[in-house]
Amino acid sequence: MKNKKSKNQQFAVIGLGRFGSTVAKTLFEKGEEVLAVDIKEEVITEAHEYTTHAVVADVTDERTLRALGIENFDVVIIGIASDLEASVLCALTCKEIGVKKVIAKAENLKHKMVLERVGADEVVIPEMEMGEKMGARLANPL
C-alpha cells in the first residue's frame, strides 16, 4: 500500500533561473503548493503557468518577505546564486523570521560555506553534484 501524505506541503521558490524554475515546475506537477518569487516581471508572468502563485518582489527586504508570509511555508528554496549578497541576505532573513527549512543554491564552495553559516539547512551546488554523479557513472559503467 502506498503511503499518502495527509496534506500538501507549501513551498516558496525564490529566484526562477533554470534551477529555481525547474524545482518549482516539478513540485507543482507533483501536486504541491508553490509560491514563485523573482525580481523580474517577465519571469513571473511565465511562472503563473506552473505555480500556485507568482509574485514580483525584492527578497533582500525583510518587510517584503514578511508581507509574503514566507515564514508560513514548509520549505523555502533559494535559487539565487549569481547574486551572492541577495542569496545570503534572503537565507539569513528567512531563518531569522522563522522559516522551518531553507534550501539554497550556491555557485561554489565558499558561497556554500557562507550560506551554511547564516543558517541554510541544506545547500546545493547543482553543477558540482551532477559532475560528481556523471564522473562516478562513467568510472563504473554497468
Question: Would you name each region that the model predicts?
Answer:
Residues 1-142:
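Cytosolic regulatory regions of ion transport systems
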